[in-house]
Swiss-Prot record:
Compartments, record wording: Cell inner membrane
Top-rank lineage group of the source organism: Bacteria
Broad class of the protein's primary localization: membrane
Organism per entry: Haemophilus influenzae (strain ATCC 51907 / DSM 11121 / KW20 / Rd)
GO function terms (MF aspect): transmembrane transporter activity
Residue intervals passing through the bilayer: 9-29, 52-72, 85-105, 118-138, 159-179, 199-219, 220-240, 271-291, 319-339, 348-368
Pfam families noted in UniProt: BPD_transp_2
Similarity section: Belongs to the binding-protein-dependent transport system permease family. AraH/RbsC subfamily.
A Gene Ontology term for the protein's cellular component: plasma membrane
Protein's name in the database: Xylose transport system permease protein XylH
Classification lineage: Bacteria, Pseudomonadati, Pseudomonadota, Gammaproteobacteria, Pasteurellales
Length: 375
């Protein structure tokens, strides 16, 4: 019960932080920050960091780390651009080939970590350097452009207004039905359930946020496709982490690897799958990045791994392993993107942007360690 209350408190703190950040930048930019156009851009920024953070949180929960995701995202995005611009591959072939490469590179990292017992810090640091080198070699150090119109839709396309409203309605109905299903399941198991008024408040708040966001986005061009991709990945990640044996194994390994082995969990196989899955998510983020930029760049993805790790830590994941949630890291990614977007609108110097994000990351880790000492 204490753990549940701590998690809920953490979520509330993150939501309050987002509200404060948005209120501050809205005042500082005379309302431009909360314009439909900027919110659309902000959510598209979040989709890339969010996709990386969803993969990263599984790695961190298992008490590992991946420093290569930024370079790998740049490499896979660059490969997608080359396949589209230089080789003229059809879009489905480009997508499949890019995701397959992400899977292969993820398995490569996972094999060294799980079966060769090389620390993930070293393996992925090597990948951080090697993947960037491969990208520069493939592109000859030049920008690959222009990407075809069919591919740019991935990063720059929008859902129609009507389709967005219908999708939002389905999301709200699905959320309510899922909440009722969980409530009945707990009642059948004679477990404690929250008051109906509290559930209704939660449903109403969810509906206001989702439908309000859709209304705002429709005031510009509609829901961006990258946001839909992030939503699907988040739902799949939530299901995988909460409702499958794989998810329970990941938490068990991060919490106590020796106990996990004694309970019969195949630690090596699980870690290999974690890194393979991370590679696939990096590939998806790379596709969105290149499609959004309309080009593949040898510098693409620089420092993206730091944003992903920061999103995880801000979202409640512990670098010691065993703790973290997909929902939390998506909120963390939104916080990171909100700061980047707001400071860019205010023309804050780059060095100050790094200092601010570094300070927030340090504060998040300090809060996490302080909470652990109290427990």
């Amino acid at each position: 019960m204490f753990k549940l209350k701590s998690v809920n408190l953490q979520v509330y703190i993150m939501l309050i932080a987002i509200a404060v950040i948005m209120a501050f930048f809205s005042v500082a930019t005379d309302g431009a920050y909360l314009s439909a156009r900027n919110i659309s851009n902000l959510l598209r920024q979040t989709s890339i960091t969010g996709x990386l953070a969803i993969g990263m949180v599984f790695v961190i929960i298992s008490a590992e780390i991946d420093l290569s995701v930024g370079s790998l995202m740049g490499l896979l995005g660059g490969f997608a651009a080359i396949a589209d611009v230089w080789w003229g591959f059809p879009l489905p072939v480009t997508i499949i080939a890019t995701i397959a490469l992400g899977l292969i590179f993820g398995i490569w990292n996972g094999w060294w970590v799980a079966y060769r017992k090389v620390p993930s810090f070293i393996v992925t640091l090597a990948g951080y350097l090697a993947f960037r080198g491969i990208l520069i070699g493939l592109t000859n150090g030049t920008t690959v452009s222009p990407i075809s119109g069919t591919m740019t839709v991935i990063g720059q396309g929008y859902l129609s207004d009507i389709a967005g409203v219908i999708l939002g309605g389905i999301a709200v109905i699905g959320f309510v039905l899922w909440g009722n299903y969980q409530r009945r399941s707990r009642q059948q198991l004679q477990l404690e359930v929250s008051a109906l008024s509290k559930d209704f408040t939660k449903y109403a708040l969810f509906a206001v946020i989702v439908l309000g966001a859709i209304y705002l986005l429709n005031d510009y061009r509609g829901i961006p496709f990258p946001v839909l991709v992030l939503a699907v990945l988040a739902i799949l990640g939530l299901f995988l982490s909460r409702k499958t044996s794989f998810g329970r194994h990941v938490y068990a390994i991060g919490g106590n690897i020796d106990a996990a082995k004694l309970s019969g969990i195949n630690v090596e196989k699980t870690k290999l799958i974690i890194f393979a899955m991370n590679g696939v998510l990096v590939a998806i983020a790379g596709l969105i990045l290149s499609a959004r930029l309309g080009a593949g760049s040898p510098s693409a993805g620089q420092n993206a791994e730091l944003d992903a790790i920061a999103a995880c830590v801000i979202g409640g994941a512990s670098l010691a392993g065993g703790v973290g949630s997909v929902f939390g890291v998506v909120i963390g990614a939104l916080i990171i993107a909100s700061l980047d977007n707001g400071m860019s609108m205010l023309d804050v110097p780059t060095f100050w942007q790094y200092i601010v994000k570094g300070g927030i990351l340090l504060l998040a880790v300090w809060i996490d360690t302080s909470n652990k000492k109290k427990m």
